[in-house]
């Protein structure tokens, strides 16, 4: 039976998905399941790692069943995942010692402050390309070892394993045979040296994490192992891994230096390919590994915006201003401007390029004339302003002026937002026909490893732009709006939460 399809497992922050692709990169089928978000304390976010696995397995089986595809028709599996989210489990029982600590979760903030006080910031920056922040896995692992009873002793005895979600899923899919991650995920842990491409002893000592917990680190496109035959009575090759944002960069075919994409999801993530050189940021961006493919490692600059789509979800769930997120577009178009209203959605602090953990959300410019339409439009516009903040930092670091921005993620269906994004950047914005670029990137990585696609050229040839948005705003209007945003951000950062 021929290998007809590639299968992507896309394990996201709010749902687990399985997507089937054909040779042209078209979607054959999708199955999705949401899972529980756990909020033990303000600012803390956790997931049940077993529920993540069960939901992922369920959608994997469902997408095959619903599309009448047999396991032996799958050429390979690619895995892409919410990055930084941390699982620690017992290697003998396979049971997690605690809930997974999610990337957004701030519970290791005190550990970060201690590390800064101890003077580790420069070392971390140089070796990992990251900042000391509760966002990254390393401080989450330390928090678990410090707070779960008996965990440190078990870890030191070699009984515990750490993994980001890709590692956890592969461990489960192979029934505990394979403990592995790829360069892109390893580069988000605070424990991996992105220049020497290995776990770094100095960083591990800083975090007091035993090396025996850590997975092997491999390129993003190679054979890692096979699914356990008890799962499907057929062993499917697992051949691609990338963190969700790097996978989207690959899925958008941003293979050349200076090409960039922005993903509009719960958060917003912009990545620019910088080729085989790790560009150190002077403007609050992260230097990260894009992927290891074809025997070489390529790097990216990344700007992480913590709250993007989550601001629209808040309008829906918190304020009950809209019934569904897509309603935001008609409200935004019901007014010509926000009438001077700016929303800075710093619900969990501000990410790139500000990195202010203490900032909280704010709305400025309210008058008696402000309506829900103005508020909703301001929330949408905040996504575009934050993207410009990041792009300006990226252009300054890389010395490259972006010619066009490739976009993907849930919010790109919003034509108002995409046009405003193009206007505020004064840059072409391209929306692809296949919006599932994260899953597509994982499929491409796996497909290259198993020979389903011959080369990156095949991938470039697959790409179809569904719609292009061109700037259509007078420059003085653009600069005036953006100046107002900068003022709002400065004011937001001036207001500190009281503990």
From Swiss-Prot:
Binding-site list for glycerol: 83-84, 135, 244-245
Activity regulation (UniProt): Activated by phosphorylation and inhibited by fructose 1,6-bisphosphate (FBP).
Binding site for sn-glycerol 3-phosphate: 13, 83-84, 135, 244
Pfam families from the UniProt entry: FGGY_C, FGGY_N
Gene3D superfamilies named among the record's database cross-references: 3.30.420.40
Any Gene Ontology biological process: glycerol-3-phosphate metabolic process
InterPro entries: ATPase_NBD, Carb_kinase_FGGY, Carb_kinase_FGGY_CS, FGGY_C, FGGY_N, Glycerol_kin
Keywords: ATP-binding, Glycerol metabolism, Kinase, Nucleotide-binding, Transferase
Binding-site positions, ADP: 13, 17, 266, 309, 410, 414
Cellular component aspect of the GO annotation: cytosol
UniProt: ATP binding residues: 13-15, 266, 309, 313, 410
SUPFAM superfamilies: Actin-like ATPase domain (SSF53067)
E.C. code: 2.7.1.30
Pathway: Polyol metabolism; glycerol degradation via glycerol kinase pathway; sn-glycerol 3-phosphate from glycerol: step 1/1
GO terms, molecular function: ATP binding; glycerol kinase activity
Superkingdom in the source lineage: Bacteria
UniProt keyword Cell wall biogenesis/degradation, yes or no: no
Catalytic activity: glycerol + ATP = sn-glycerol 3-phosphate + ADP + H(+)
Subunit structure: Homotetramer and homodimer (in equilibrium).
Family recorded in the similarity comment: Belongs to the FGGY kinase family.
Main function: Key enzyme in the regulation of glycerol uptake and metabolism. Catalyzes the phosphorylation of glycerol to yield sn-glycerol 3-phosphate.
Annotated protein name in UniProt: Glycerol kinase
Organism annotation: Brevibacillus brevis (strain 47 / JCM 6285 / NBRC 100599)
Gene assigned in the entry: glpK
């Amino acid at each position: 039976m021929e290998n007809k399809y590639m299968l992507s497992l896309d394990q996201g922050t709010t749902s687990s998905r399985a997507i089937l692709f054909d040779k042209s990169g078209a979607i054959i089928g999708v199955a999705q399941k949401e899972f529980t978000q756990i909020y033990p304390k303000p600012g803390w976010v956790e997931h049940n790692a077993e529920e993540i696995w069960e939901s992922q397995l369920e959608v994997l089986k469902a997408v095959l069943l619903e599309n009448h595809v047999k396991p032996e028709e799958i050429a390979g599996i690619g895995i892409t995942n919410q990055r930084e989210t941390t699982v620690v489990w017992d290697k003998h029982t396979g049971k997690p010692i605690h809930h997974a600590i999610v990337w957004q979760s701030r519970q290791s903030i005190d550990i970060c402050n201690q590390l800064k006080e101890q003077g580790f910031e420069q070392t971390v920056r140089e070796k990992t390309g990251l900042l000391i922040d509760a966002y990254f896995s390393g401080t989450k692992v330390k928090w678990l070892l410090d707070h779960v009873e008996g965990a440190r002793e078990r870890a030191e005895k070699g009984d515990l394993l750490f993994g980001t979600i890709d590692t956890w899923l592969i461990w489960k899919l192979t029934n505990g045979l394979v403990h592995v991650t790829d360069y892109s995920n390893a580069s988000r842990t605070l424990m991996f040296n992105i220049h020497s491409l290995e776990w770094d002893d100095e960083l591990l000592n800083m975090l007091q994490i035993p090396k025996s917990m850590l997975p092997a680190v491999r390129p993003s496109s190679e054979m890692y192992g096979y699914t356990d035959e008890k799962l499907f009575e057929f062993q499917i090759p697992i051949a691609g891994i990338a963190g969700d944002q790097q996978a989207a960069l690959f899925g958008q075919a941003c293979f050349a230096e200076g090409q960039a994409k922005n993903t509009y999801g719960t958060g917003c993530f912009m990545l620019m390919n910088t080729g085989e050189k790790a560009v150190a940021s002077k403007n609050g961006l992260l230097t990260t590994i894009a992927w290891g493919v074809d025997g070489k490692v390529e790097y990216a600059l990344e700007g992480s915006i913590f709250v993007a789509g989550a601001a629209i979800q808040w309008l829906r769930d918190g304020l009950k201003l809209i019934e569904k997120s897509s309603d935001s577009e008609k409200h935004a178009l019901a007014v010509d401007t926000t009438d001077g209203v700016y929303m800075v959605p710093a619900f969990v602090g501000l990410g790139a390029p500000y990195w202010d953990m203490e900032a909280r959300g704010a709305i400025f410019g309210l008058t008696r004339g402000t309506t829900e339409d103005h508020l909703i439009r301001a929330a949408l516009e905040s996504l575009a302003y934050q993207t410009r903040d990041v792009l300006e930092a990226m252009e300054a670091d890389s010395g490259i002026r972006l010619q066009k921005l490739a976009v993907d993620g849930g919010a790109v269906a919003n034509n108002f937002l995409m046009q405003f994004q193009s206007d505020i950047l004064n840059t072409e914005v391209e929306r692809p026909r296949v919006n599932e670029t994260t899953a597509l990137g994982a499929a491409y990585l796996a497909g290259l490893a198993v020979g389903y696609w011959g080369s990156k050229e095949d991938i470039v040839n697959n790409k179809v732009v569904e719609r292009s948005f061109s700037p259509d705003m007078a420059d003085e209007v653009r600069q005036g709006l953006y100046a107002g945003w900068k003022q709002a951000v400065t004011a937001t950062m001036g207001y500190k939460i009281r503990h």
